[in-house]
Curated annotation (Swiss-Prot):
Pfam families: Proteasome (PF00227). The gene is hslV. It comes from Rhizobium meliloti (strain 1021). It comes from the Bacteria. This is ATP-dependent protease subunit HslV. Coiled coil: none annotated. Disulfide bonds: none annotated.
Amino acid sequence: MHATTIITVRKGGKVVMAGDGQVSLGQTVMKGNARKVRRLSKGDVIAGFAGATADAFTLLERLEAKLEQYPDQLMRAAVELAKDWRTNKYLRNLEAMMLVADRTVTLAITGNGDVLEPEHGTIAIGSGGNYAFAAARALMDSDKSAEEIARRALEIAGDICVYTNHNVVVETLDAE
């Protein structure tokens, strides 16, 4: 997935999701201040997406509907979305990935039907995801806060990945 980097860090009673703002079309930067991290479900869930923007918005709308159907059950809503995404002929062609988090869980949702919970308190997606993930993992044992780790990881990813910029949007929730 090109065009962005999204990371989630869970540490010190906080869950932070951060994403850059670059939108690319081929080799051209079309926009530098897109908002790819947002709140859902009355602010109780944060979500970030990488991939085709229209596809991601379709999936965010579907996730919002699943959260209304299964209130306060992010895992259940994510699994139901992943099942629909994988089995629905229309949705199957959508090209995006999502990170979602609430007070209790962080999940990556893919079009392959995967719903993955990170093992080490952090997970990242997108073209710069591997760089951000490695940077965050290296910083998890430091005295930095979850937000500081997320911002630094995106800064490093933005220095390396041509599809990631330094215009960072951050959303934070209290974690359990």
